[in-house]
Amino acid sequence: MSPRAGQTRSAGQTRSAGERSLVGLAALLALFLALPVAVLVGRAVLDGSLGASLGSETVLAALGLSLATTAVSLTVTVAIGLPLAIVLVRRRFPGKWLLEAIIDLPIVLPPSVAGLALLLVFGRRGLLGEPLDILGISIPFTTIAVVIAQVFVSAPFFIRSARAGIAAVDADLEDAARVDGASEGQVFRTITVPLASGALAAGLVMSWARALGEFGATIMFAGNLEGRTQTLPLVVYAEFQGGDLDASIAAAAILVLAAFGVLVAVRVFRWGRALDVRASA
């Protein structure tokens, strides 16, 4: 065997050992992430608490409130976040970096801090609380407060993903459409959104999942009022604090299954789009 062949074989063995190590580490990480969730859902299913919780008025009310508020918060997030993402990508202006940092700030803020900050703005003695109180408007500890808390903590996830998707769209394609007489709305609907749809969908899922699981800001700003501000994560906490571990596990399992179902649906949607693109190529 020549020295060069020996070196090649040795390098191949080293690379193979390194790859096996990486695969092993990846498997350990996957197990670390999946095992607690699997045990949670498995226990809820096997002991029957999941089925029982679906007949609980408290759980059903919290689930309905969670779905309703996250639908509203996601609508608000898209209505505000998508135009903002376009401006941040396509425009240059002084202080842009500061605005981007402010938008991303809720991602790293502890949720309880976010809730306290919202209370200092919208609370009865807050910055806007007194003027709103004069108008007869009270926001804290209402369903509106739940939506505001969800938008505050979840919008940055959508905006960040939308910015990445829009930045990947070739601006020359948009300019070409304008030259051909397309309006800004037509360019947006026929060029920007379709080409950035993957990133937009990912942002929607991340934002919705964050809103669905929101706890800290909600309990600080909106409270834990059954039928009014008690979302499903708050039921998990309330049942655990009350000593009903089975009910807490069941409510948590519903959250896991709902979030996982949406993630799977989006994966299937993106897989289907990829197949369509390949078929048309």
What are these regions (language model features)?
Residues 16-48, 57-167, 191, 195-216, ...:
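Membrane-water interface segments at the C-terminal ends of transmembrane alpha-helices
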Residues 94, 172, 182-184:
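Short coil/turn motifs that cap or connect alpha-helices
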Residues 177:
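The alpha-helix within a helix-turn-helix
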